[in-house]
C-alpha cells in the first residue's frame, strides 16, 4: 500500500514539476480583468455568499450519545411523574439498525409504540424523528427503546404530553452502559426538533453527510456507490464546525460561491465584454438548482465547480493554440484541466461525461489549429495521455485512502479500487431498481 501511494504522489508531483519547468517562459493570453472587474467580482461574490449563508444550518451539536451496539441493548426513559404522552422526538446519529419502542403504563402494562422511522426502508442518519402516540387515558411511567439489530445512536430526546408541554423531569439509564445519560434530555425543549432543514439531514444528505462523518473518523463508510473525494471535502467542514447541519453544508456552499467569480472570469475571457460577464454571473447566481443544491451536502455542486474549471482551462488551451502558441506553452492549461477532470471524477462519475468533449477539443486543437507533423502529433498525444488519463487516475486512486484506511483487512489499493469500480457499476446499472429513498 505504501509503495502504491508513493508512486501515485510521485506521478502528480513529477508531472507538475515538468509542466512548470517547461512552460515557465511561455506567454499566456491575459484574462483582461481591470479594477472594475475585480470590484464587480467582489461585490457579486460577497453578495451571493451572504445570501447563501442565510439559514444554511444550525451549529447545534449533541455531546451525549447512547450507543445501541448489539441486540438486546435497551434505553429506559422513566417519567418521574407519570403522564399522558402525546409525542416522542429523538435525534438519531448512525442509524443502520432495527429497533422498537414500547411504553409501560401505571398499571404495569407494556405496549408497543408504532415508530414510522423504524420502517422507512432507509436509515434515518443524523436527523430528528417523530413518534405520535395514540390518544389514551393511560398514564405512562416508562418508555423503552430496544435494539433488535445494531447499530443505533441516540443523541437527544424530546418528549411532550398530550397538551404539547415539554417533559424534562426524566431519569434515563441503559442496560449496556453505566454512563451518565442525562445529557440526552435538555432542561427546555431543544431547538429545531421538528425535523427541520436547519437541524436534520435532508434527502441524500442522509447518505453523504453520514459517509463524510464516517470517513473523518475512520469508520466503515455507508456510501460506496460514488468516489469518495466529494464526501472527504464535506468531512472537512465537519472537522471544522462539527457534525452539525452547518458543518456538513459549508463546503458545498463554498463551492457554489466560488462558481460565481469563476463564471465571471470565464465569461469575460470568452466574450471579451464586461456586460456578458455580468449577465452570465447573474444567471448562475439566480439559477434555482445552483442555489438549492449548493446549500445541501450533495456532490453535485462540488463536481460542477471542477467541471467548469476544467472547461475554463481547456478554453485557455484553445485560445493559446489559436494564437499560434507552441504546444509547450499549453502545458499549464492542459495540466490544470487534467487536474480539474481528475478531481471531478473523484467526486462523481457524472464528470466522466466531459471526457468526450475533452477528446474533441484536444483533437481540434492539435490537428485543426496546430497542423502538426506526425512526430509533433505523437508527442502531443503522449503528453495529453499523461495529463488526461494518468494524472486523473492517480488523483482518483489517492481519493480512496481514507476509505481503505477504514477497512482493516485491505492493504492493496489498486485491487480495492477495482472491486469498488465493479461494485459501483453494478449498483448504478442494476441496484437502483428496487431501492428505497428518502
Where are these regions (language model features)?
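Aromatic-rich transmembrane-lumenal/periplasmic boundary elements in polytopic membrane proteins
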Residues: 164-212, 393-438
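Short hydrophobic/aromatic helix or loop-helix immediately within or flanking a transmembrane segment
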Residues: 206-216, 222-243, 253-254
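Transmembrane-helix motifs of polytopic, lipid-linked glycan transferases
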Residues: 246, 250-271, 309-313
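Short acidic/glycine- and proline-prone juxtamembrane loop motifs at membrane-interface regions
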Residues: 248, 252, 289-303, 350
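Transmembrane-helix signature of polytopic, membrane-embedded enzymes
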Residues: 258, 263-286, 304-305, 322-329
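Specific aromatic-rich, kink-prone transmembrane helix
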Residues: 262, 302-327, 336, 340-341
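Short helix- or helix-capping micro-motifs
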Residues: 280-285, 292, 341, 345
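Perimembrane helix-loop-helix junctions
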Residues: 313-324, 341, 354-393, 398, ...
Amino acid at each position: 500500500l505504501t509503495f502504491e501511494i508513493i508512486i501515485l504522489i510521485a506521478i502528480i508531483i513529477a508531472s507538475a514539476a515538468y509542466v512548470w519547468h517547461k512552460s515557465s517562459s511561455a506567454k499566456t493570453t491575459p484574462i483582461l480583468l481591470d479594477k472594475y472587474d475585480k470590484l464587480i467580482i467582489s461585490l457579486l461574490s460577497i453578495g451571493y455568499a451572504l445570501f447563501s449563508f442565510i439559514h444554511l444550518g444550525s451549529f447545534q451539536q449533541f455531546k451525549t450519545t447512547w450507543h445501541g451496539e448489539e441486540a438486546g441493548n435497551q434505553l429506559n426513559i422513566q417519567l418521574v411523574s407519570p403522564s399522558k404522552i402525546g409525542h416522542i422526538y429523538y435525534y438519531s446519529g448512525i442509524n443502520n439498525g432495527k429497533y422498537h419502542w414500547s411504553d409501560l403504563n401505571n398499571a404495569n402494562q407494556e405496549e408497543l409504540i408504532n415508530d414510522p422511522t423504524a420502517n422507512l426502508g432507509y436509515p434515518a442518519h443524523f436527523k430528528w424523528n417523530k413518534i405520535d402516540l395514540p390518544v389514551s387515558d393511560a398514564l405512562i411511567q416508562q418508555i423503552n427503546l430496544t435494539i433488535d439489530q445494531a447499530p443505533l445512536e441516540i443523541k437527544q430526546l424530546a418528549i411532550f404530553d398530550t397538551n404539547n408541554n415539554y417533559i424534562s423531569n426524566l431519569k434515563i439509564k441503559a442496560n449496556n452502559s453505566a454512563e451518565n445519560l442525562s445529557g440526552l434530555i435538555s432542561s427546555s425543549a431543544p431547538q429545531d426538533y421538528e425535523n427541520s432543514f436547519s437541524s436534520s439531514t435532508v434527502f441524500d444528505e442522509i447518505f453523504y453527510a453520514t459517509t463524510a462523518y464516517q470517513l473523518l473518523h475512520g469508520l466503515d463508510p455507508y456510501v460506496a456507490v460514488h468516489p469518495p473525494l466529494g464526501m472527504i471535502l464535506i468531512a472537512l467542514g465537519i472537522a471544522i464546525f462539527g457534525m452539525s447541519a452547518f458543518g456538513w453544508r459549508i463546503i458545498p456552499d463554498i463551492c457554489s460561491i466560488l462558481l460565481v467569480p469563476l463564471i465571471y472570469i470565464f465569461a469575460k475571457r470568452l466574450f471579451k465584454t464586461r456586460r456578458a460577464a455580468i449577465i452570465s454571473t447573474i444567471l448562475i447566481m439566480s439559477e434555482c438548482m445552483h442555489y438549492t443544491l449548493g446549500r445541501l451536502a450533495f456532490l453535485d455542486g462540488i463536481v460542477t465547480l471542477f467541471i467548469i474549471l476544467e472547461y475554463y482551462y481547456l478554453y485557455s488551451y484553445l485560445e493559446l493554440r489559436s494564437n499560434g502558441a507552441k504546444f509547450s506553452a499549453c502545458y499549464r492549461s492542459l495540466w490544470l484541466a487534467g487536474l480539474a477532470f481528475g478531481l471531478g471524477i473523484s467526486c462523481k462519475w457524472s464528470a466522466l461525461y466531459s471526457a468526450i468533449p475533452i477528446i474533441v477539443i484536444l483533437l481540434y486543437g492539435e490537428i485543426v489549429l496546430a497542423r502538426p507533423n506526425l512526430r509533433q502529433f505523437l508527442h502531443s498525444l503522449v503528453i495529453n495521455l499523461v495529463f488526461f488519463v494518468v494524472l486523473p487516475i492517480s488523483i482518483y486512486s489517492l481519493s480512496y485512502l481514507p476509505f481503505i484506511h477504514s477497512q482493516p483487512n485491505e492493504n492493496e489499493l489498486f485491487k480495492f479500487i477495482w472491486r469498488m469500480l465493479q461494485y459501483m457499476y453494478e449498483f448504478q446499472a442494476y441496484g437502483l431498481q428496487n431501492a428505497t429513498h428518502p
